[in-house]
From Swiss-Prot:
Transmembrane segments: none annotated. Plays a role in viral genome replication by driving entry of quiescent cells into the cell cycle. Stimulation of progression from G1 to S phase allows the virus to efficiently use the cellular DNA replicating machinery to achieve viral genome replication. E1A protein has both transforming and trans-activating activities. Induces the disassembly of the E2F1 transcription factor from RB1 by direct competition for the same binding site on RB1, with subsequent transcriptional activation of E2F1-regulated S-phase genes and of the E2 region of the adenoviral genome. This is Early E1A protein. It is found in: Host nucleus. Changing T123H: Abolishes increased sumoylation of human ZBED1. The lineage of its organism: Viruses, Varidnaviria, Bamfordvirae, Preplasmiviricota, Tectiliviricetes. Changing C157S: Loss of transactivation. Keywords: Activator, Early protein, Eukaryotic host gene expression shutoff by virus, Eukaryotic host transcription shutoff by virus, G1/S host cell cycle checkpoint dysregulation by virus, Host gene expression shutoff by virus, Host nucleus, Host-virus interaction, Inhibition of eukaryotic host transcription initiation by virus, Inhibition of host innate immune response by virus, Inhibition of host interferon signaling pathway by virus, Inhibition of host STAT1 by virus, Interferon antiviral system evasion, Metal-binding, Modulation of host cell cycle by virus, Modulation of host E3 ubiquitin ligases by virus, Modulation of host ubiquitin pathway by virus, Oncogene, Phosphoprotein, Transcription, Transcription regulation, Viral immunoevasion, Zinc, Zinc-finger.
Amino acid sequence: MRHIICHGGVITEEMAASLLDQLIEEVLADNLPPPSHFEPPTLHELYDLDVTAPEDPNEEAVSQIFPDSVMLAVQEGIDLLTFPPAPGSPEPPHLSRQPEQPEQRALGPVSMPNLVPEVIDLTCHEAGFPPSDDEDEEGEEFVLDYVEHPGHGCRSCHYHRRNTGDPDIMCSLCYMRTCGMFVYSPVSEPEPEPEPEPEPARPTRRPKMAPAILRRPTSPVSRECNSSTDSCDSGPSNTPPEIHPVVPLCPIKPVAVRVGGRRQAVECIEDLLNEPGQPLDLSCKRPRP
């Protein structure tokens, strides 16, 4: 870019326009992106952001200017009005405050104690829970083992042999591999099947019979003779009527009577005050006059 010397310190309008055109052509011509509509970043663009910044070449210099002692003094609330020691002074990895040391370095109105390294013991010396009696009694736990030769060198078989005392016993896996059979636990007894509920009895229909007829009672003057005994009975019959299979001619049929709830018919009101001589018959109605 060429240098333009302005005489008198005045830049005209034509000179300013030429300077801007020259700036655009020489500086921004190659890196100028094409104009485009602004679009917000997508979720993938926000998720794939690269937050790993390159190493700062000034990080070491800044760390020397502001050592750990200054940062610790700021945390402790100590005002430092002067600069810390010159760069290059080594700082220990861990600093602790020891006010009992009389030697102090004046950094301003408020003195800051000297910081010396201290080894911190991070070992936990607290006693844990005491072991319970159950853990001692359990001993070795059962572990299912798979060996090349079933029953030889198997930890599962050794566990069962040690607990049972039988030297020839094998675990279920070795027994299955040797005999080709599975080991099943004892089968429990089958549950009793519920008894089927009895079906409700259906009402049986009675066989149809010939209609029963009532025999007309004999009058006081009639006489009936029994052919089997050759005896005759006189007077009204007190026995129930007999049932005959043959229907006689002109039988007496009962007539349905409607029961009424009206009071007894009286001639005058005084009849209601007197006690009735016979029970009130409500089966029939007296016809109206």
